[in-house]
Amino acid sequence: MPKMKTKSSAKKRFKMTATGKVRAGQAGKRHGMIKRTTKFIRTARGTTILSAPDAKIVKSYMPYSR
């Protein structure tokens, strides 16, 4: 059986933590930031942990991640 392929789009957008959770960048920061509140910009600065249903889908895209 051939090796499974990792989806390139997923490996560029998501990182796995040491405990197996999926980390992703916050959404909604590409354009239109002038109308966003300062609080939104500040809280969307870092990354976030995906919810369990979303993480399950992303993990299926990256079969060889930790």
UniProtKB/Swiss-Prot annotation:
GO terms for biological process: translation. InterPro entries: Ribosomal_bL35, Ribosomal_bL35-like, Ribosomal_bL35_CS, Ribosomal_bL35_sf. Residues 1-32 are annotated as: Disordered. One of its GO terms (molecular function) is structural constituent of ribosome. It comes from the Bacteria. Residues 1-15 have a biased composition (Basic residues). Keywords: Ribonucleoprotein, Ribosomal protein. GO terms for cellular component: cytosolic large ribosomal subunit. Coiled coil: none annotated. Transmembrane segments: none annotated. Belongs to the bacterial ribosomal protein bL35 family. This is Large ribosomal subunit protein bL35. The gene is rpmI.
